Amino acid sequence: MSQSTIHKIAVKKRTETGKNENNRLRSSGMIPVNIIGAGVATSGAVNEKELAKMVHSGIRQSTLIELDVEGQGQQKVFVKEIQRFPEIDRIRHVDFYKVVPGQKIVTKIGIETTGVAKGSKTGGQFEHIIHEIRVKTIPEDLLENLTIDVTDLDVGDSIKISQLKVPASWEILINGDPIVTSVNKTKALLAAERAEAKGAVPDDAKAKKGKK
């Protein structure tokens, strides 16, 4: 398991809003943001370069971010939405939502694997099917990624959602119990098994043939 990394960024409060003000902010190297929590939205602005660096570092919805808000101090948040200009790779606006300790939230958690499946060394094909899951949990138990060890997976083995080792507070929001990873027989391995089966002679048949 990979604990959620805390990223930090400063937020300058703003009282003026609207299209013209937002354009003025962007031309000065700042990006408008909203901080949402308890039904209240606070308008602010962050340094565009610092924000882009944080976003490009691979943050997810489950990444904990610490905002240093002008006049309000530090606030822990998650990213709710990142808006971009469609014609260029530039951030237009970001919505954050505040973390309330002990209050469950719904977010997405990535699934990573570690190790080399045993079955892939003997002709099997390893498959990583589900790369992300939706989870309802408390902020204190959030993970940026869930890492599963596939070293012991042999040909024909699989790991299902119900077999994942996760914090007790987690409720995985998914239908059924699908397979996350598996090691399947390749076409070559199946063909070899069929050929071997066709060429096999039962022991009693061999004995009868020897008596003739």
Curated annotation (Swiss-Prot):
Keyword Cell division recorded: no
GO cellular component, one term: cytosolic large ribosomal subunit
Keyword Ribonucleoprotein: yes
InterPro entries membership: Rbsml_bL25/Gln-tRNA_synth_N, Ribosomal_bL25/Gln-tRNA_synth, Ribosomal_bL25_b-dom, Ribosomal_bL25_C, Ribosomal_bL25_long, Ribosomal_L25_dom, Ribosomal_uL5_bac-type
Biased composition (Basic and acidic residues): 13-24
Membrane-spanning ranges: none
GO molecular function ontology, one term from the record: structural constituent of ribosome
Pfam families reported in the protein's UniProt record: Ribosomal_L25p, Ribosomal_TL5_C
Keywords: Ribonucleoprotein, Ribosomal protein, RNA-binding, rRNA-binding
Domain of life: Bacteria
Region (Disordered): 1-25
Alphabetized SUPFAM superfamilies for the sequence: Ribosomal protein L25-like (SSF50715)
One Gene Ontology biological process: translation
Subunit comment: Part of the 50S ribosomal subunit; part of the 5S rRNA/L5/L18/L25 subcomplex. Contacts the 5S rRNA. Binds to the 5S rRNA independently of L5 and L18.
Alphabetized NCBIfam families for the sequence: bL25_bact_ctc, PRK05618.3-2
PANTHER family cross-referenced by the UniProt entry: RIBOSOMAL PROTEIN L25/GLN-TRNA SYNTHETASE, ANTI-CODON-BINDING DOMAIN-CONTAINING PROTEIN, RIBOSOMAL PROTEIN L25_GLN-TRNA SYNTHETASE, ANTI-CODON-BINDING DOMAIN-CONTAINING PROTEIN
Family, similarity comment: Belongs to the bacterial ribosomal protein bL25 family. CTC subfamily.
Role description: This is one of the proteins that binds to the 5S RNA in the ribosome where it forms part of the central protuberance.
Protein name: Large ribosomal subunit protein bL25
